[in-house]
């Protein structure tokens, strides 16, 4: 990429001293130290105190930097005792320093860093005080105590004298905001979908309590290298000192800044850095994505530039872009001789990456530092004294961003084999050779760790981590981090480590869960969501013709961003939905601040009428890009999302290829590994297991293994038994049914039973018999089965003594109820009497035995009789036994007609 040489600012231009956001620069003579122009200051003599009170104070060491320092500052009015401890967590393992040779070859060095010289601490006697200093070249940094802020810097031509400049003496240099603006007091929590809010709140407290780690790379451009006297080591130390201050600012938010690399463009700029901050920002972000990310893994990158940006801007960063490949970064103008100035600006721009908006009066933010003492870091208008704390609004904005899914990369604990400056028990980091580290013995509250030796106490398995409870590891499958949105994946304890696995989320391009969109960097962006953000509840995207007509103009109100010449770019037809967002409905005016302008466009239709398109032009400050543009990752067509203001196919992410390896039983995560369903095992979800992935741990707890195995064994046994039954089915059928009586056969046989009463005689067995026989197997109705009945002839032709056996119901009444059967002229008039004595009176005359035995299945008999009604004359009807009611006559009881059996 061609280099754009930095333009030298005129000598009369002042250093801009305010934070990011539109800030006015006070004018000062170039070349004079700002510290010489700020009015009164105190001269302090510094000495290093020894633990032995009898040893006099020593000078601050220039090369040897102990782990712990106690420094005495002797002032004219009082003495201050500073307790300092080296910031061991500032530098991660694998930290690199990169510079370039004259031919452009990059040189990356990984040093042992025995010259660690960056400290955090407090003023003795004031627990609320804050100290952030470096001792690389004398004492330099900030001191906050008794609600006052001081800046400490070495004096020239001396080794033990320092300037202690109070904040009050710096109020004559004040930056003003070039535009009174604010994104709004409407946070993202207010406009996110209700279901997502409820799911996010369940994990809100857990997320906020967890420590977040920003793996940061700081780059100095060529102009910054020149401003620091072309001293490579001086530039590197300055960048690390800036990171040390920023880490101190963010600690109250439970965020740690971990420096993974510094880079100095000591030969030429690697991308175009000009006085246009917008162009410089996007050039740097493009270089980061294409060049820096492939060779150095990190979460965020910030450029410290020696170029004076035009206008009032001293920094710029995209809003809520942390962890994204395209926009996680910012540019900062080094506007002060002290590294503290650039550190505050970097903290401000990093806040925008976190989703923090400017603090304004209309938001009603609470700040514990008064404006005359610096105020808060996200103030849009500030200057000396530098702000060093965050407001309540910033905390709320951060919480809302985390709930929405921003910052998926922040929950990964950086690898620390040996902290910056060497291993030390008591620094709070578990380093190589340590089992635990809970800090110094006087501050350790961990009952599982021995603070003196950094070893576990007896019977303790672990001491730290979300998967450690009561000094023991939680069982595998225990949830340790829930999903925060529709594109996030939960994490579970593995049972082998005390820390929760690194955060993972759905692969870019994967459809959102329950939302019409695609996941991108762990967030589901949609046009509808952005319309609600701009216009409030009830807003929705406008028809496609609005995007096409408005964004083809290439002006401030309809465009696809800016081109390399900082001119508004027209949108191609295919990219129209990736330009300025077009909405309908919602509030009468944008809800995102007083500087938001409504742009309404009416498009006539051929059939009559007009389509109203509502866009916005929002000026949120020089340090924030236009929020009215469609966000990266938003769905612009089926199978496509917006990337770099272009509507591109999701296949560029490789999501389909990745999903194929999961066999339809899981989804692909951002590390291109399968996250399997609960009963399938990673890595490919093709075997039974406990779900999850190799990155996030098992979904189900392993203590269910015994139950699962038992169920599987039972199923296998049942299958084996069923197979044996199938093979021996004929033998079993003969054994079960050849010598057994069916239920209806038992009804026909004479067995003891309850004597039926008169009123129920005709229906006692009607309904049960019918239901039973309807389910009977058809083969029981064959003639062979009918002839095999053993008790039927005895029951009909030779009845037992009625006095010994209770009266049974007549089987034919089950099939042929009297109320449905027409009576024959000579048939019996009444049913059998209830008293057995009646049958004794007719014992002289016996009815003729039936010509055929009764069938085995009386219910099926009806259909058989129906088909057999056509008979030869004189053929006797089978199965109907006359029911005598009086002494039988001498003649045979007439047979009923054929119609008597028709139903």
Curated annotation (Swiss-Prot):
Q: Where are the transmembrane segments?
A: 707-727
Segments forming domain Disintegrin? 422-508
In the induction comment, the record states: At the onset of myoblast fusion.
Q: Which residues form the propeptide?
A: 32-205
Signal sequence bounds: 1-31
* Binding residues for Zn(2+): 177, 348, 352, 358
Q: How is the cofactor bound?
A: Binds 1 zinc ion per subunit.
| Pro residues compositional bias, start-end | 847-856
Q: Give the protein's biological function.
A: Involved in skeletal muscle regeneration, specifically at the onset of cell fusion. Also involved in macrophage-derived giant cells (MGC) and osteoclast formation from mononuclear precursors.
**Miscellaneous comment as given in the Swiss-Prot or TrEMBL entry:** Marker of skeletal muscle regeneration.
Instruction: Report the protein name in the record.
Output: Disintegrin and metalloproteinase domain-containing protein 12
Q: Which organism is it from?
A: Mus musculus (Mouse)
- The gene designation is Adam12
């Amino acid at each position: 990429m061609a280099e754009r040489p930095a333009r030298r600012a005129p000598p009369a231009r002042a250093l801009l001293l305010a934070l990011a956001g539109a800030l006015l620069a006070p004018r000062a003579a170039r070349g004079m130290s700002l510290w010489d122009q700020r009015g009164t200051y105190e001269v302090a003599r510094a000495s290093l105190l020894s633990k032995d009170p009898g040893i006099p104070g020593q000078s601050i060491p220039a090369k040897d930097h102990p782990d712990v320092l106690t420094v005495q500052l002797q002032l004219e009015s009082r003495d201050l005792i500073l307790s300092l401890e080296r910031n061991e967590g500032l530098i991660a393992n694998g930290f690199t320093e990169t510079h370039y040779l004259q031919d452009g070859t990059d040189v990356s060095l990984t040093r042992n860093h025995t010259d660690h010289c960056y400290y955090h601490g407090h003023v003795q006697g004031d627990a609320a005080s804050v100290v952030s200093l470096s001792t690389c070249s004398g004492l330099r940094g900030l001191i906050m105590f008794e609600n006052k802020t001081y800046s400490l810097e070495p004096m020239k031509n001396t080794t033990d004298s320092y300037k202690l400049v109070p904040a009050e003496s710096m109020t004559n240099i004040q930056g003003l905001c070039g535009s009174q603006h604010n994104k709004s007091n409407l946070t993202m929590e207010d406009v996110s979908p209700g279901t997502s809010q409820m799911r996010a709140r369940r994990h809100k407290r857990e997320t906020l309590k967890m420590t977040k780690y920003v793996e940061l790379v700081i780059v100095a451009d060529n102009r910054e290298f020149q401003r620091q006297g072309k001293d490579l080591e001086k530039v590197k130390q300055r960048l690390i000192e800036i990171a040390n201050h920023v880490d101190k600012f963010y600690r109250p938010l439970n965020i740690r800044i971990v420096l993974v690399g510094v880079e100095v463009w000591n030969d030429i700029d690697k991308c175009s850095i000009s006085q246009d901050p917008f162009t410089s920002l996007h050039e740097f972000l493009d270089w980061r994505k294409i060049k820096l990310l492939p060779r150095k893994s990190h979460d965020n990158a910030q450029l410290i530039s020696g170029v004076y940006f035009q206008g009032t801007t001293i920094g710029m960063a995209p809003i809520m872009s942390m962890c994204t490949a395209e926009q996680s970064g910012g540019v900062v103008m080094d506007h002060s001789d002290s590294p503290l100035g650039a550190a505050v600006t970097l903290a401000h721009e990093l806040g925008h990456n976190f989703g923090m908006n400017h603090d304004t009066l209309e938001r009603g933010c609470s700040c514990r530092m008064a404006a005359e003492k610096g105020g808060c870091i996200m103030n849009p208008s500030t200057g000396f004294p530098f702000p060093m704390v965050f407001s309540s609004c910033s905390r709320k904005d951060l919480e809302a961003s985390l709930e929405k899914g921003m910052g998926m990369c922040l929950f990964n604990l950086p690898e620390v084999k040996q902290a910056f400056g060497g291993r030390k028990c008591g620094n709070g980091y578990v380093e190589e050779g340590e089992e635990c580290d809970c800090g110094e013995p006087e501050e350790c509250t961990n009952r599982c760790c021995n603070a003196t030796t950094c070893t576990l106490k007896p019977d303790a398995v672990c001491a730290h981590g979300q998967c450690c409870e009561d000094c023991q590891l939680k069982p595998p499958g225990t949830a340790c981090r829930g999903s925060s949105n529709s594109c996030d994946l939960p994490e579970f304890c593995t049972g082998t480590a005390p820390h929760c696995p690194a955060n993972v989320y759905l692969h870019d391009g994967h459809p959102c869960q329950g939302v019409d969109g695609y996941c991108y960097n762990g967030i589901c962006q949609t046009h509808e969501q952005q319309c609600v953000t701009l216009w409030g509840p009830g807003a929705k995207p406008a028809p496609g013709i609005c995007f096409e007509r408005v964004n083809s103009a290439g002006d401030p109100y309809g465009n696809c961003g800016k081109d390399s010449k900082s001119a508004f770019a027209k949108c191609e037809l295919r990219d129209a939905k990736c330009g300025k967002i077009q909405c309908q409905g919602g509030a009468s005016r944008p809800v995102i601040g007083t500087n938001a302008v409504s742009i309404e466009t009416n498009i006539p239709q051929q059939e009559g009428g007009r389509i109203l398109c509502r866009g916005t032009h929002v000026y949120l400050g020089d340090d924030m890009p236009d929020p009215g543009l469609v966000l990266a990752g938003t769905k612009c067509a089926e199978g496509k999302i917006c990337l770099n203001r272009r509507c591109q196919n999701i296949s560029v992410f490789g999501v389909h290829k990745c999903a194929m390896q999961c066999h339809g039983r899981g989804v692909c995560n951002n590390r291109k590994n399968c996250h399997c369903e609960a009963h399938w095992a990673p890595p490919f979800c093709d075997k039974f297991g406990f779900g999850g992935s190799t990155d996030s741990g098992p979904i189900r707890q392993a203590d269910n293994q015994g139950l699962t195995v038992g169920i599987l064994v039972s199923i296998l046994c049942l299958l084996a038994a069923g197979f044996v039954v199938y093979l021996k089915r004929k033998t079993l059928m003969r054994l079960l049914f050849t010598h057994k009586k069916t239920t209806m056969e038992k009804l026909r046989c004479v067995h003891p039973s309850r004597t039926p009463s008169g009123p129920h005689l005709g229906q006692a067995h009607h309904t049960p018999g019918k239901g039973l026989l309807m389910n009977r197997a058809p083969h029981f109705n064959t003639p062979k089965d009918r002839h095999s009945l053993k008790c039927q002839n005895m029951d009909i032709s030779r009845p037992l003594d009625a006095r010994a056996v209770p009266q049974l119901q007549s089987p034919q009444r089950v099939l042929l109820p009297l109320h449905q059967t027409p009576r024959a002229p000579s048939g019996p008039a009444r049913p059998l009497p209830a008293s057995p004595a009646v049958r004794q009176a007719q014992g002289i005359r016996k009815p003729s035995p039936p010509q055929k035995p009764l069938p085995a299945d009386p219910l099926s008999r009806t259909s058989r009789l129906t088909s057999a009604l056509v008979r030869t004359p004189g053929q006797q009807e089978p199965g109907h036994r006359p029911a005598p009611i009086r002494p039988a006559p001498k003649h045979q009881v007439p047979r009923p007609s054929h119609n008597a059996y028709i139903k």
